[in-house]
């Protein structure tokens, strides 16, 4: 099945992908009230996933791929067959940052791949309290714990390895010990670097303004 045939658009030709978000279903009017957005297109229309310039919305690509099917055949099976043809392994890094349709796409795609490896750290996920809707971080029962996350991935058919990458090459022994004792996260260090945990309450501005100090903030 093709995307064009799925939406009964036989002559559709895409022009790539854009990073612009698609029009939301509801928007605020001048009075601050939520009203229907006339630019919104329903999910059963190709224009829900494609701009007027025939570019796919990046934000809805996974959702689109999941629904294109015809009988027992699907776009996911077709994509997996091509990946298997050209690649021995499919490697996905930062797996913990995938959720909702992106997460579902990976899980369903994996069922048809010859070999796939997912690498990720639950405790480094970028999902916050504001955007934690959907799998694997939100279920009808509530938020998902580390144990729940591991069980969810295991139930999807994956073998779980929690030890191979348990040693950090980035963090020092002191930092790892601090994390383990305060947050009860099982992490150790390879000991390749020196580093200490310090409180910068009184020198925060000096640290931020000092270009000689490497920081993970902007």
Placement of each model-derived feature along the sequence:
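The feature marks helicase ATPase cores and/or their adjacent C-terminal helical subdomains
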Residues: 1-218
């Amino acid at each position: 099945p093709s995307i064009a045939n799925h939406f009964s658009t036989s002559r559709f030709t895409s022009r790539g992908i854009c990073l612009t978000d698609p029009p939301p279903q509801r928007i605020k009017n001048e009075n601050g009230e939520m009203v229907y957005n006339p630019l919104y297109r329903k999910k059963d229309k190709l224009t829900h996933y494609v701009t007027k310039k025939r570019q796919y919305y990046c934000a809805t690509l996974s959702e689109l791929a999941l629904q294109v099917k015809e009988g027992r055949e699907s776009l996911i099976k077709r994509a997996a067959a091509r990946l298997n043809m050209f690649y021995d392994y499919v490697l996905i890094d930062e797996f913990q940052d995938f959720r909702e349709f992106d997460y579902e796409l990976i899980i369903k795609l994996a069922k048809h791949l010859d070999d796939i490896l997912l690498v990720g750290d639950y405790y480094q996920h970028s999902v916050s309290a504001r955007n934690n809707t959907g799998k694997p971080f939100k279920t009808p029962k509530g938020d998902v714990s580390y144990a729940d996350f591991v069980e969810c991935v295991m139930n999807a058919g994956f073998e779980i390895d929690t030890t191979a990458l348990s040693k950090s090459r980035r963090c020092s022994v002191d930092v790892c010990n601090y994390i383990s004792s305060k947050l009860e996260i099982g992490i150790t260090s390879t000991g390749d670097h020196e580093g200490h945990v310090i409180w910068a309450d009184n020198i925060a501005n000096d640290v931020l303004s000092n270009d000689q100090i490497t920081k993970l903030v902007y």
